[in-house]
């Protein structure tokens, strides 16, 4: 039987021991692997100015730890992102750049918004 990688879905948060700033994310990887991915971006993508990476560079990556919020087995990336979005909206983390991860507008609404110059 085929197992989707999304059966290993999880919602996590990055916290630091300097202040109350947090980041919420989702992954299908082990948390230690996901944390290494963030640390790689901090070191190797210096032009990436997302809030999380700017904060990690400013106060030091050694001050950040990753914590599991919820194991969330699901069937698709969309399901996982919707769950992540739920937690972002609940706790309002300060280091997330985006709060809307899934665009739920219909194609008609998207076309209207593009025509009117909205994002």
Where in the sequence are the language-model features?
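Structure-specific nucleic-acid interaction/processing domains
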Residues: 2-118
